């Protein structure tokens, strides 16, 4: 196994890349504009932060993949559950950080679910049809984005800035294995000072059994899924300098689920809904830019465990969460060399729940809330020759329960020449305890403090006409991580976690038609926590649950002609550990290699046919102990554009 890993590292070092296409586009960094790194528009080569852009073109070459599966191919990211049955929990682990330590943004605004233990957002509620591009910014980003941004942020951008015609249509439909159908349509246009976008997407599948039939009885039923997403956005340019945008999104899905590890259940389902709405104002004149954002988000999750043969007990669980987010920030440039940014935000979250059992009656989780207010500021400096860039910033946060905390960011970078650049960062991050962790009747702890981290990283990047590569080393330290105490049965600040790692990515285009892309991630962790076998003493683990030490992705893309494109990709995931059960040793999950393929043919500007296949070898593997991962899956589809 060590020889295989060394071979993969060697290959990654020479022709590595992010498995999609920023990557494949070969666009120079001084032509890529990003906003997530510093909350202001800037060229990617002027920030020292580690940022990856997944473009609209890349997303369109993703076939029938989900958002979680696309993120799972990026360097340094593991989305555990992305390769399980539709509707299963998808947990984002960036650079090995625990669940809920990677902040999901929607057009720059935090997305949280206060009704969950870790407040992490359900990726099942997004579809690729909703997205124009994705910006991934790694490292502690709490200075600009607040709680949960310990490992980084993933900014899902839905705003299309390049709309000129009054009416445009894009639609895709596909059909595949397990009776899977995907349909989506987007209507958008610009009329006078108004710009509008409306999207609808639907995913339906018969699926496969979520739980693994370890006894081989072959009597586990398939667990189906049906989801819908509809969203709309309207922007009005009141003047040359001032615009306002309103948005509304409703996402819902119903998924059959099983009783647990190795355990089937025929009348058990989850019904998940989110309503997301808000508005933003933007004033931009000369060197001044002022942005105001407001977002209201309501999540409702309903679990229904119906009567089953031999189990005449009926139970339901309901969890409801509401968040309100307000933000106002402004940036000002001085002679294009110095940018000052100052802002503040207010976050209010509340949750309630109810449990009903035909055997035990009903109980309710009372409506409980928390709020936090922050002020933040940063300074960006660019030297006269644009070689040296420097960002420094800080945030002060006041939480209604635990009080005050602060963060900082120091981020220099240096462009040696047009090919080489160096960058580094020292930054702190934090995660506020969730409402559940504070107020739950049995496990809540009202004395919990914010989990704090310090992140160090340094890297080098190279690019020429045919090859580009980036290598990053990082180290993250947490001394008061939030964990569950198996002695007192309450949450407490206890975990000590140190994670060092290496990320390597590159793209190589030996000839015009061929692009080779690959990435490699290495984790070297130490986590001191309670012993999961005894639940009594303290132990230091040299691994992280469900997070492999080595991950390697590679993609070969061939543009055979202007109209025909084909790609083959592979993914290697090293062995990792998962929970073995209550007071049992952790279990080791085997490594695996998956082979995928994609092809598309454009009949003309308006019509494109595509086919994609995942796990071509039908490899049997597990992402989560006791749950099935996807078998061989294939989809064929057609895309229509009128624009």
Identify what each model region corresponds to:
Residues 239, 335-341, 345, 349, ...:
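Structural signature of Gram-negative outer-membrane beta-barrels, strongest in the C-terminal barrel
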């Amino acid at each position: 196994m060590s020889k295989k890993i060394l071979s993969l590292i060697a290959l990654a070092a020479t022709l590595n890349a992010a498995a999609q296409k920023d990557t494949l586009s070969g666009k120079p960094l001084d032509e890529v504009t990003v906003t997530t790194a510093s909350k202001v528009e800037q060229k990617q080569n002027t920030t020292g932060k580690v940022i990856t852009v997944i473009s609209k073109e890349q997303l369109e070459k993703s076939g029938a993949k989900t958002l979680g599966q696309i993120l799972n191919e990026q360097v340094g990211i593991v989305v555990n559950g992305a390769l399980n049955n539709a509707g299963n929990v998808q947990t984002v682990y960036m650079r090995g950080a625990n669940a809920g330590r990677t902040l999901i943004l929607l057009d720059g605004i935090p997305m949280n679910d206060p009704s969950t233990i870790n407040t992490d957002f359900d990726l099942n509620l997004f579809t690729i049809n909703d997205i124009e591009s994705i910006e991934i910014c790694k490292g502690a980003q709490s200075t600009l984005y607040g709680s949960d941004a310990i490992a980084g942020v993933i900014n899902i951008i839905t705003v299309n800035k390049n709309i000129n015609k009054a009416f445009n249509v894009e639609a895709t439909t596909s059909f595949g294995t397990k009776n899977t159908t995907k349909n989506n349509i987007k209507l958008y246009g610009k009329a006078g000072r108004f710009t509008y976008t409306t999207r609808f997407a639907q995913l339906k599948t018969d699926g496969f059994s979520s739980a693994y039939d370890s006894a081989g009885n072959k009597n586990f039923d398939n667990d189906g899924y049906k989801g819908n997403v509809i969203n709309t956005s309207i922007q009005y340019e009141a003047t040359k300098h001032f615009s306002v945008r309103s948005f509304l999104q409703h996402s819902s899905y119903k998924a059959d689920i099983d009783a647990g590890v190795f355990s089937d259940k025929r009348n058990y389902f989850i019904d998940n809904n989110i309503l997301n709405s808000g508005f933003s104002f933007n004033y931009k004149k000369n060197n001044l830019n002022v942005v105001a954002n407001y977002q209201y988000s309501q999540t409702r999750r309903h679990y229904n465990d119906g009567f089953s043969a031999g189990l005449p007990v009926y139970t339901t669980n309901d969890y409801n969460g509401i968040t309100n987010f307000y933000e106002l920030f402004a940036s000002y440039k001085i002679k294009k060399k110095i940018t000052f940014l100052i802002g503040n935000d207010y976050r209010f979250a509340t949750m309630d729940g109810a449990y009903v059992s035909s055997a035990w009656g009903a109980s309710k989780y009372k409506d409980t809330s928390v709020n936090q207010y922050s002020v933040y500021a940063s300074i960006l400096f660019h030297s006269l020759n644009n070689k040296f860039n420097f960002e420094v910033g800080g945030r002060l946060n006041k939480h209604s329960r635990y009080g005050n905390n602060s963060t900082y960011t120091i981020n220099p970078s240096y462009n040696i020449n047009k090919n080489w650049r160096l960058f580094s960062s020292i930054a702190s991050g934090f995660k506020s305890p969730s409402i559940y962790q504070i107020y739950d009747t049995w496990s809540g702890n009202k004395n919990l403090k914010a989990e704090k981290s310090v992140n160090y990283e340094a890297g080098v990047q190279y690019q020429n006409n045919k090859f580009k590569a980036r290598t990053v080393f990082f180290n993250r330290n947490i001394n008061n991580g939030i964990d569950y105490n198996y002695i007192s049965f309450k949450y407490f600040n206890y975990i000590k976690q140190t994670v060092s790692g290496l990320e390597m990515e590159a793209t190589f285009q030996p000839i015009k038609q061929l692009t080779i892309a690959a990435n490699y991630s290495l984790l070297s962790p130490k986590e001191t926590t309670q012993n999961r076998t005894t639940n009594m003493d303290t132990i230091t683990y040299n691994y992280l649950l469900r997070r492999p030490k080595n991950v390697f992705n590679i993609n070969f893309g061939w543009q055979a002609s202007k109209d025909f494109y084909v790609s083959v990709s592979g993914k290697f995931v090293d062995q990792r550990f998962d929970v073995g059960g209550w007071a049992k040793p952790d279990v080791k999950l085997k490594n695996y290699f998956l082979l995928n393929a994609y092809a598309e043919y454009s009949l003309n500007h308006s019509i494109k046919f595509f086919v994609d296949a995942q796990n071509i070898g039908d490899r049997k593997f597990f992402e989560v102990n006791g749950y099935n991962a996807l078998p061989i899956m294939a989809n064929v589809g057609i895309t229509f554009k009128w624009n």
